[in-house]
Regions:
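Patatin-like phospholipase
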Residues: 25-109, 124-402
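N-terminal signal peptide c-region/cleavage motif recognized by signal peptidases
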Residues: 19-22
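Active-site loop->helix "elbow" adjoining a glycine-rich segment at hydrolase catalytic centers
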Residues: 114-115
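Bacterial N-terminal signal peptides that target proteins for export
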Residues: 2-13
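Hydrolases whose catalytic domains are alpha/beta-hydrolase-1, hotdog thioesterase
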Residues: 119-122
Length: 402
């Protein structure tokens, strides 16, 4: 979740970890399980609430069964929320300001990764939850998210405990919110969150609406666990363990930040392409369609990147840690760009309007540390102002035609 700042210390941490690993012989023991058991595992006794995000299209197709617009033929409005740690304050502000403008859509599909996962339930439910969304990103402080000694954490499972983040999520995600998401799910809308199963090295797509509508007594607990897991950077935070069972064998799955696998889950590429029904033409195996048939023309794809995408020139200091941090930041931008480009190509091919917003280089406020509240307030205000006056959406990836 807080990768941008943690990257500054990644090289130092790696060096110390290599030294300490030999000493850390008291690691927590885990119940072994097999890959075959994982394929059939049911999380916390609640079946039918997830799939591999990189699964074949024929499998992903089931996740959009009974999606409202697919049944009525109406245009689809989709929102994808990226990772970005404390930079999520930008997306939160934009959504709140967009509500105030009176033009924010009622999204049919919302996806969230990492910090985008934390805000996704509120984005999905609309303006009546804007107060919670604002509180989440304007009242957050270092101590409300981080606890523990990072040096002692080198001998554990993460530099920091997820306990404070769990408390933050529990304070905002309650049974009423779960019930509202369940109602939206039954009305044909979909909310998805990505975590990374570290044992499998694969991204997991959680159908949060199906989970909310399951009626299972542990649904709220699992819902919260998924949000925390998606925002828990591996190594920085303890992983989130999710109880699972397969053929009578009980074990714990290890889940971490969804951004480990995907910085952004682009719905059109992995889900809508799977339906084979968006334009009424299914031409081949796995429901793939012929290009250019664009059935739901008029639909909208909105992508909010809680980060900056534009290159920012700076003479890099010739020091190991500065070089590592600069390289990591470059890698993150490149990863975002590739995903955005895929989304744009899909939208153009299928007749959707592509809409992109991200933090501009003109934003010059600097963060002075992890979870800098003043910095987050400035980012929230930036996004909020954009939303109120009318978001100037970019309809192509940056630098594509210039």
């Amino acid at each position: 979740m807080f990768i941008p700042h943690l990257a500054r210390y990644s090289a130092k941490i790696a060096a110390v970890v290599l030294t300490c690993n030999a000493v850390a012989a008291t690691a927590e023991q885990r119940t072994p399980y097999t890959e075959a058991e994982l394929e059939n595992a049911v999380p916390m006794g609640i079946p039918g609430v997830r799939a591999w995000a990189d699964a074949p299209l024929s499998v992903l197709k089931t996740q959009l069964a009974n999606l409202g617009p697919l049944l009525t033929g109406q245009p689809i409005a989709m929102l994808a929320l990226s990772g970005g740690g404390e930079h999520g304050a930008y997306g939160a502000g934009l959504l709140c300001g967009w509500s105030e403008s009176g033009h924010r859509p009622n999204f049919d599909i919302v996806t969230g990764v990492s910090t985008g996962a934390l805000m996704s339930p509120f984005a999905f439910l609309g303006s009546k939850y804007d107060d919670r969304l604002k509180a989440l990103y304007t009242q957050m402080t270092f101590h409300s998210v981080f606890s523990g000694n990072p040096f002692l954490g080198l001998f554990g499972q993460g530099l920091y405990s997820t306990a404070p983040l769990q408390r933050v999520v529990a304070s905002q995600v309650d049974q009423k919110l779960l019930d509202d998401i369940a109602t939206a799910y039954r009305n044909g809308r979909r909310l998805f969150v990505i975590t990374t199963n570290l044992d499998a090295q694969r991204p997991v797509l959680w159908n949060m609406g199906a989970l909310a509508a399951s009626g299972h007594p542990q649904a709220l607990e699992l819902f919260r666990k998924v949000l925390v897991a998606s925002a828990s950077v591996a190594g920085a935070f303890d992983p989130v363990y999710i109880d699972a069972e397969a053929n009578g064998h009980h074990f714990k799955e290890m889940h971490v930040d969804g951004g480990t696998a995907y910085p952004l889950f682009a719905v059109p590429v992995r889900l809508l392409a799977a339906t084979g029904e968006v334009d009424g033409h299914s031409d081949g195996q796995d429901g793939e369609r012929k290009s250019g048939q664009g059935g739901h023309s008029g639909g909208q794809i909105y992508v909010i990147i809680n980060n900056n995408l534009d290159p920012a020139f700076a003479v890099t200091k010739p020091k190991t840690f500065n070089i590592a941090a600069r390289a990591f930041n470059t890698l993150v931008k490149a990863s975002f760009y590739d995903t955005i480009l895929n989304s744009y190509v899909y939208a153009k091919d299928e007749g959707y309007t592509f809409n992109l917003a991200y933090i501009p280089n003109s934003f010059e406020v600097k963060s002075v540390g992890l979870v800098d509240q003043k910095y987050m307030l400035a980012l929230f205000d930036l996004g909020h102002a954009e939303g109120v006056r009318g978001v100037e959406w970019q309809h192509t990836p940056p630098r594509l035609f210039r």
